[in-house]
Amino acid sequence: MTTKEFILSAIKTNRQTLKRLGIRNVGLFGSYSRDEQSIKSDIDILIDFNPEMENFDNLMAVCDIFEDLFKNEKVEIVTKNGLSPYIGPKILNEVVYV
């Protein structure tokens, strides 16, 4: 099973590529950020785009990067702008930024 440390290290290693796609901040949230993951857990990643670079193509490229990094895991990507007003504050409180 993937570890929190592996996920954070993989994100850090790819930080420059993500930056070129307009990502200002990227972080891990959910069960992995709380060290409560199980075999059924997905990897929850929060991304924050530079407004002028937030577009479908860049989002799909970011999704492809994370799917390649974590091939055997389910990955959920959420943009900061796409956070629900109800659960968003909880996510922002627990996110571990890289």
Regions found by a protein language model. Name each.
Residues 1-25, 33-39, 52-98:
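Catalytic core of pol beta-like nucleotidyltransferases
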Residues 46-48:
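Short hydrophobic/aromatic beta-strand micro-patches
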Residues 28:
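Conserved histidines in hydrophobic membrane contexts and catalytic metal-binding motifs
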